[in-house]
Amino acid sequence: MSRPRRRGRDINGVLLLDKSQGMSSNDALQKVKRIYNANRAGHTGALDPLATGMLPICLGEATKFSQYLLDSDKRYRVIARLGQRTDTSDADGQIVEERPVTFSAEQLAAALDTFRGDIEQIPSMYSALKYQGKKLYEYARQGIEVPREARPITVYELLFIRHEGNELELEIHCSKGTYIRTIIDDLGEKLGCGAHVIYLRRLAVSKYPVERMVTLEHLRELVEQAEQQDIPAAELLDPLLMPMDSPASDYPVVNLPLTSSVYFKNGNPVRTSGAPLEGLVRVTEGENGKFIGMGEIDDEGRVAPRRLVVEYPA
């Protein structure tokens, strides 16, 4: 007879983890899941092991809405090593080419300007995008290069921070799907010297407050503190979570009266006043505005359910 599967807590929310360098995003996710004893967990856009910074971890029902964070913009601080190109476009790869750094300040400014605004980017072979059902980095590790189509991205802001010796520091505010490693590699080619990432930190995701980020070390300290005080760790850990609907905070809210929300939660589209004419909406119910799921305005102007919160018994 197989063992019954161990079930974690029904804890719902988003932890803004400050990921440390050298750890994979999945390792970070599993550690947070264990600390919170959560029944489900997922992250919203991986960070390379070399990178640090904001990694939103969705727990419980929040995992249903993590996809909306994947569509959000992000901000990074990056330091590039000029004069060296690597196979992965970062310091974890092998140096494949070395060239002298000879560009002028004017040439640097002109090159940076070509990366601002709406541009197209060919993803790195060392990415998790798939080709014929297989991740690109799996091909790359076998020495195989496959065709990749250029994808549209937007660089809302590209700030020059400093250029000292063979180091170049930038801050980049960009749209979903932007590979900072690829920007640095492409920039190095424009400058004629090659470049790769030696430091990368994700400063922000969507509108999440930076001051709410916490490290794994801090979470462990809270668990120890709870043990010393003889209280459940959840009393110290759970207040760190952002609301479960925070991944969808950019979408308008439609509040349903309780008489309508019961139909919505049973999978039926409902009519209500004050709804937008089209698009996705966050749906709440009652006077307290309890979040019950995501809806979409259908062709008849009704709010149709798309993703619903499952209410577990206490």
Curated annotation (Swiss-Prot):
The active site is at D48. GO terms for biological process: mRNA pseudouridine synthesis; tRNA pseudouridine synthesis. Keywords: Isomerase, tRNA processing. Substrate binds at H43, Y76, Y179, L200. GO terms for molecular function: RNA binding; tRNA pseudouridine(55) synthase activity. It is an enzyme of class 5 (isomerase). Its EC number is 5.4.99.25. InterPro entries: PsdUridine_synth_cat_dom_sf, PsdUridine_synth_N, PUA-like_sf, PUA_sf, tRNA_psdUridine_synth_TruB, tRNA_sdUridine_synth_fam1_C, TruB_C. Pfam families: TruB-C_2, TruB_C_2, TruB_N. It catalyses: uridine(55) in tRNA = pseudouridine(55) in tRNA. Responsible for synthesis of pseudouridine from uracil-55 in the psi GC loop of transfer RNAs. Belongs to the pseudouridine synthase TruB family. Type 1 subfamily. This is tRNA pseudouridine synthase B. It comes from Escherichia coli O139:H28 (strain E24377A / ETEC).
